[in-house]
C-alpha cells in the first residue's frame, strides 16, 4: 500500500508527463467510485482509494498502516489468512495465520489448538494424550474409540458391519460401518502405520502380528559416523562428562542432550561388562581351568555363574 500526497504540479517535466493522462479516472476511488480531492491518496495495484475507504471488506475495520489486497478486495491480516491462507486447519477448514497456535502432524495435518478435538465425541484432545490419526479423512479421535482387540477365539469376523459401542463415559451410540471399512485388526495396523508423533503426541501401544498389545519405545536415534567419532573421542578423555560438557557436545554434534546422556550410560555399561568378562576369564585362566559357558540374564536358565561373578554392574549412573 502506497501513500501519495496530492499537490500542484511544480515542474515542467511533471506537466509533460501528465499530458494524455485521464486524471478523472486516475484520481477516482476504486471503492466508492467517487473523485478523490483529499490531500493524501492511497494507491494499491494501480488503484486509488480515499483514506477512509481503506478498510477490511469483512469487518470494516480501518487499515491505516497495513492491509492485504486480493481480487479487488481489501482485507485485514486476520480475515485475509482466514479466507486465503495456503495452510488450512483440518478441523474448522479455515485458514491458518502465522500468529495462530497450531498442532502440526508429520502427515501434513494442521489443527488450531481450539479445533484439536475428537471427530466422534467432540472432546478436546490434550497434549500428551494418545490419539488415532486418519490422514485420509484428515481427522483425529481419542483412544476411547479405538477398536477392540481381535483374538483367534473370539471377536467379530473381518468385514463386520458394526463396531461395539464406546465406553460408558462417552455419549456416542454405536454407528454403522461402510462395507469397505477395515476390520478391527486392520485398523490397528493402520494406526501403527499412521500414528504420527508431533510435539506432545505419543503413541506407545500398538498391535503386532499376533494381535498382542506391546509397549513400544520411542523412535530410535541414528548417530552418524562423524557424530560417533566425536562421542568416542570425548569418552576416551572423559567417560562421565558433566552436564555442561554434554551441552557443548550437543551443540557441536546436533544431537540432543538426552541422546548423548543415554549414549554415555550405555557405553559405560558396555565397558563395565567387558571389564568383568575379562576378570571372569582371567579368574579361571590363572587356575588352569576352562571357564563354563557364559549365559546372560535374558537367557532362560536356573543359575548364571558369570552374572554372579560380576554382581550388579548394570545399575544406572547418577547424572549431574
From Swiss-Prot:
Transmembrane segments: none annotated. PROSITE patterns: HOMEOBOX_2 (PS50071), LIM_DOMAIN_1 (PS00478), LIM_DOMAIN_2 (PS50023). GO terms for biological process: neuron differentiation. CDD domains: homeodomain (cd00086). GO terms for cellular component: nucleus. Keywords: Developmental protein, DNA-binding, Homeobox, LIM domain, Metal-binding, Nucleus, Repeat, Zinc. GO terms for molecular function: DNA-binding transcription factor activity, RNA polymerase II-specific; metal ion binding; RNA polymerase II transcription regulatory region sequence-specific DNA binding. Residues 216-275 bind DNA. SMART domains: HOX, LIM. InterPro entries: HD, Homeodomain-like_sf, LIM_Homeobox_TF, Znf_LIM. Specifies differentiation of the set of six touch receptor neurons. Binds cooperatively as a heterodimer with unc-86 to sites in the mec-3 gene promoter. This is Mechanosensory protein 3. It comes from Caenorhabditis remanei (Caenorhabditis vulgaris).
Amino acid at each position: 500500500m502506497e501513500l501519495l500526497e496530492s499537490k500542484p504540479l511544480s515542474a515542467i517535466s511533471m506537466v509533460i508527463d501528465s499530458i494524455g493522462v485521464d486524471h478523472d479516472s486516475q484520481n477516482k476511488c476504486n471503492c466508492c467510485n467517487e473523485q478523490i480531492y483529499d490531500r493524501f491518496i492511497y494507491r494499491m495495484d494501480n488503484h486509488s482509494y480515499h483514506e477512509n475507504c481503506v478498510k477490511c471488506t469483512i469487518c470494516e475495520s480501518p487499515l491505516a498502516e497495513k492491509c492485504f489486497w486480493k481480487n479487488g478486495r481489501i482485507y485485514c491480516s486476520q480475515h485475509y489468512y482466514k479466507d486465503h491462507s495456503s495452510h488450512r486447519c483440518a478441523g474448522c477448514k479455515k485458514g491458518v495465520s502465522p500468529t495462530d497456535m497450531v498442532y502440526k502432524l508429520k502427515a501434513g495435518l494442521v489443527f488450531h489448538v481450539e479445533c484439536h478435538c475428537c471427530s466422534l465425541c467432540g472432546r478436546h484432545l490434550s497434549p500428551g494424550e494418545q490419539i488415532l490419526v486418519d490422514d485420509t479423512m484428515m481427522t483425529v479421535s481419542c483412544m476411547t474409540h479405538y477398536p477392540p482387540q481381535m483374538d483367534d477365539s473370539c471377536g467379530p469376523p473381518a468385514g463386520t458391519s458394526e463396531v461395539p459401542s464406546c465406553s460408558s463415559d462417552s455419549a456416542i451410540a454405536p454407528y454403522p460401518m461402510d462395507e469397505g471399512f477395515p476390520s478391527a485388526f486392520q485398523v490397528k495396523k493402520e494406526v501403527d502405520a499412521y500414528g504420527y508423533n508431533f510435539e506432545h503426541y505419543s503413541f506407545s501401544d500398538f498391535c503386532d502380528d499376533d494381535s498382542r498389545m506391546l509397549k513400544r519405545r520411542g523412535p530410535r536415534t541414528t548417530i552418524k559416523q562423524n557424530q560417533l567419532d566425536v562421542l568416542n573421542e570425548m569418552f576416551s578423555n572423559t567417560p562421565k562428562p558433566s552436564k555442561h560438557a554434554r551441552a557443548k557436545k550437543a551443540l557441536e554434534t546436533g544431537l540432543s542432550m538426552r541422546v548423548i546422556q543415554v549414549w554415555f550410560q550405555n557405553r559405560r555399561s558396555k565397558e563395565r561388562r567387558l571389564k568383568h568378562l575379562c576378570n571372569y576369564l582371567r579368574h579361571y585362566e590363572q587356575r588352569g581351568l576352562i571357564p563354563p559357558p557364559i549365559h546372560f540374564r535374558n537367557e532362560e536358565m536356573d543359575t548364571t555363574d558369570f552374572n554372579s561373578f560380576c554382581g550388579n554392574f548394570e545399575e544406572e549412573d547418577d547424572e549431574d
